[in-house]
Amino acid sequence: MPVRARGLTVEGADGRRYLDCLSGGGTLALGHNHPVVLEAVRKVLDSGAPLQVLDLATPVRDAFVAELLRTLPPGLAGRARVRFCGPADSEALTAAAGLARAATGRTGVVAFTAACHDTPAGPCPHGGPGDAAPVTRLPCPEGRRCPFGGGEREAEGAARWAESVLDGRVPGVGRPAGVVLEAVQDEEAVVVVPDGWARRVRRTTADRSIPLIADESHTGVGRTGAFWAVEHSGVTPDVMVLSQAVGGSLPLAVVVHRDDLDVLPRDADRSTFRGNQLAMAAGAATLAHIRQNRLARHAAGLGARILTRLRELAGRFPWVGDVRGRGLMIGVEPVAPDLDGEAGTGPSGAPAGAPYGCARRPCPAAAGLAAALQRECLRRGLIVGLGARHPGVLRLLPPLTITAEQAEAVLDRLADAVEAVDAVARHHTGRASGLPPCPRD
């Protein structure tokens, strides 16, 4: 039971200290109780200012908007409008889709998903307030289990299929009101979409006058090594959905959009909590601190080193499987490989580094191994998460303030947990995974 926390460290009621690499699901960009966040919140509380104002303008709101505009991609910042909505990312996505529907007169929404995962994606928030709209889900090239194969063929196939849908050439699917793009699909097991493919989606939507909605709920505010994940590919969206870390640890969500899409009245969203002054103050302080201290760049460099170390660990323990991510958004997907070959090789002598240690096709994900690894991490004082829709993926979301020394401590504890899981599995089954070997053609 946690009773105190500061930065990366959480202290339990028993006095034990934990390293928190879940960060409230990514909401704590600066870690627990960062001084700049606490100071900003105290300042509002001590001022006697109203804490909830719905759509009224306030100095706190103006300061948040001004700081947010400083961080936006240049192509959007100069003509951006900021719309506040309910504090959940689902409410922000609903508001963004409703805006696109009102601007285009169309109803449907297209979203991309890692469609070949074992677990189907959950429902996508859509439509305007109180309405429902059809959502068409298209596969994105994610290099693992995509129906279009791998490499360039995968990206080309996914792009051409998307173009067919957006042109209205697929029976039963009309031209959509908007296209939702998430540069790193966090809910879809930390899948990083190719930058080239993202640029092609941007060109495709622009050529057809279809608003591109960048969902930065999970990826924004420096998490991936750029302030906004779409900046890795140079994509400038028409609409951005922001939540999670944008509130500086407090509930806040906003929709940023081009001025020519400003077709709805300010009070179109009826959510009660869209004017939270404490969240706006904490959010403005967080945005400013990350910008001024270049924490996105820090996340890029340190995240790359963490990924390298984790891939080295996967080379020693093939069942660790796939290590992927960007910046400080990292996923580890344990798998059930065929261990007939030597360590670091797949069946039939597949070379080290082949996907999941398998020669012909990916090994199945092993949710049991991921859960066991999470438990062993916790026993060693390391808090990590599991994918919401894909519990076979271990998620690491440390605060952007994590130091190189702290990262080494995290990696040491994780490596120790891997060794413990491996030893137990081998003792009971003779295989590291404890699961059947990878299927062969």
Predicted region positions:
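Conserved N-terminal phosphate-binding loop of PLP-dependent enzymes in the Aspartate aminotransferase
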Residues: 1-441
